[in-house]
Amino acid sequence: MEISYGRALWRNFLGQSPDWYKLTLLAFLIINPLVFIFQPFMAGWLLVAEFIFTLAMALKCYPLLPGGLLAIEAVVIGMTSAERVKDELATNLEVLLLLMFMVAGIYFMKQLLLFIFTRLLLSIRSKTVLSLSFCLAAAFLSAFLDALTVVAVVISVAIGFYGIYHRVASSSSDNDLQDDSQLDVNKRDVLEQFRAFLRSLMMHAGVGTALGGVMTMVGEPQNLIIAKAAGWNFTEFFLRVAPVSVPVFICGMLTCFLLERTKTFGYGVQLPGAVRDVLHEFDLKSRSQRTRQEKLALIAQGIIGAWLIFALAFHLAEVGLIGLSVIILATSFTGVTDEHAIGKAFTEALPFTALLAVFFAIVAVIIDQQLFTPIIHFVLQASPDSQLSLFYLFNGLLSSISDNVFVGSVYINEAKTALESGAIGINQFELLAVAINTGTNLPSVATPNGQAAFLFLLTSALAPLIRLSYGRMVWMALPYTVVLTLVGLLCVKFTLIPYTQWLMQIGILAAH
């Protein structure tokens, strides 16, 4: 019997999301206009809290849908205007171009990245060295590429290796990777160990993207927003953030080493010998079948990667345009000429790009309703040294439960407003920009909500295969969260100001 129109409409609304989630969103949409009539300031904060809720519930429904509905309503009832949203999008066009073109460009270099991580996994036998290598490789790549793409590549490697062993162990050429029923007891034990091994590697790589992503203006989308607000190029951004990012990187790598040595928090599991044998045999077969055309494609991707790093380091063009050049060069020299094949590169980035546009709509509400003005006034009443720590902590707290791009955008806008109003000087603003950048990037590893790369991992096809749940991810990230947050705070408090002053004294950094 066919369902009623009312039931069909309810099922269509937000699709497979739970009924309680749909009811909650409807309640938000009904309450907001009523509160806005009587208390616009309170309604603005309510909207921000609701939007953070949609980000936290990203596994129930992709935040673009509920967040977008909230943003549309905010414009309709007058919390902000379409013109203000357009201005915010225009101001942050470089970030949108970064996501559209850079992520798509790196898609055409996946073969090279897959080759790098495959060689690491099979050529290094020590789990500690392998973990450090994965963390280091992810950090280096994320400093120049998009963290989402780096994680996507590592996920591809892990799913590929998992599938190879699972098919051999279950003696099936086309089996369901979720189905373990055809495995005997011994093979199931080996598979469980392999899952634990992959979980630890994925978490090391995920944290590596945060360690590298904080260092450069292209490492994370919010970095570019902050760099533009401060007027920094690629080199200046790296130098200004270095007094915090470099010590944090060293301590992060040390944490990786200690976790593998102590075998705590789910780390330290070795790659089973039976799995290594299967993977090694498969790799030998694949390498022997690699054609000259495929080898040349790898070389071309390596050269394009060198061009990417060179162009970014010397700021030869806007980041998004460099990404566009990567798309053109990579497709031209690897033989990808079909429109549909090129189109696949954009499917990864465009949903998040659209979500970022919604972020900026919420930022427009925050600006028009002056929501953060009381917080900023409170922070600016503190001493200059304390301001840095407070900005870092406020950013870190919000970034651990919400998306760090959103948080970074909000706080750098407020700091810029304080600069323009004369509440702070240019030197203090630049120090605050570093505190905001590190505050949004480092503590956000606490939960998948804060880091887009972590959320991407949690919602990927790999997560259920290796039994990586939300709770387990938070638990495995905990030691990194504590170390990165505390070391970052100490560096902001004690090393940032003297290091920056020293760079200015010797003429490496110019006073603005």
UniProtKB/Swiss-Prot annotation:
It catalyses: 2 Na(+)(in) + 3 H(+)(out) = 2 Na(+)(out) + 3 H(+)(in). The keyword 4Fe-4S does not apply. InterPro entries: Na+/H+_antiporter_NhaB. It is found in: Cell inner membrane. GO terms for cellular component: plasma membrane. It holds the Pfam family NhaB. Keywords: Antiport, Cell inner membrane, Cell membrane, Ion transport, Membrane, Sodium, Sodium transport, Transmembrane, Transmembrane helix, Transport. It comes from the Bacteria. GO terms for molecular function: sodium:proton antiporter activity. It is a multi-pass membrane protein. The chain crosses the membrane at residues 28-48, 52-72, 97-117, 144-164, 201-221, 237-257, 296-330, 347-367, 390-410, 446-466, 474-494. Belongs to the NhaB Na(+)/H(+) (TC 2.A.34) antiporter family. PANTHER family: NA(+)_H(+) ANTIPORTER NHAB, TRANSPORTER ARSB-RELATED. Na(+)/H(+) antiporter that extrudes sodium in exchange for external protons. This is Na(+)/H(+) antiporter NhaB.
